[in-house]
Amino acid sequence: MLKINGEIFGDESFWNKQAVYKKPKLNTDINTSTLLFESNKDIANLAMAHSYLNIHAPEQKKLLLMPYLPYSRMDREINDQIFSLRYFADILNNMSFEKILLADPHSKVSSDLINNLEELNIEDIILDEILPKIDIDFIMFPDKGAKEKYTKKYLKLCKKHKVIYGQKKRDLSNRGKIKEYSIIAEDIDLKDKSSL
């Protein structure tokens, strides 16, 4: 899904599957596009929105907010698969956003490839707004790499809770499909427990 200044852009279609683009309300200083990636259609909508903003609001700054970066996990060539992140980064860089705000770039490769990228710190949001509303026994990361990255990045959060992680075995000849998954919990009893 794509939003311009909080309003959904390009979510309707004509009978032939072409998107219906309604004129968005524009701000006088900064226009924010928010990419909530669901499919490649959202990237086409972003390109259309950006072109519209260039023509109808050329003097205003353009900001892109992306909680999730599409193709961030394709940060290198794997077997016969292309380095998709590089080409998506080219698409974003050609749009010349003044700033791109991202919740998690996944790897340093994203930061190296994308111009004007700033990472959002979501630790305080988790601590102040999410955790008070839920009861958790531990934090679970999907794999060892995520555990190593986020226990350093979200130190306050990880000091308050026990941490467990998953261990994946992938079939790289089959698009990285997970063949086996186990949970590494060391001495933590997982029965009837909840995690974030």
Language-model segment annotations:
Residues 1-196:
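PRPP-associated nucleotide enzymes
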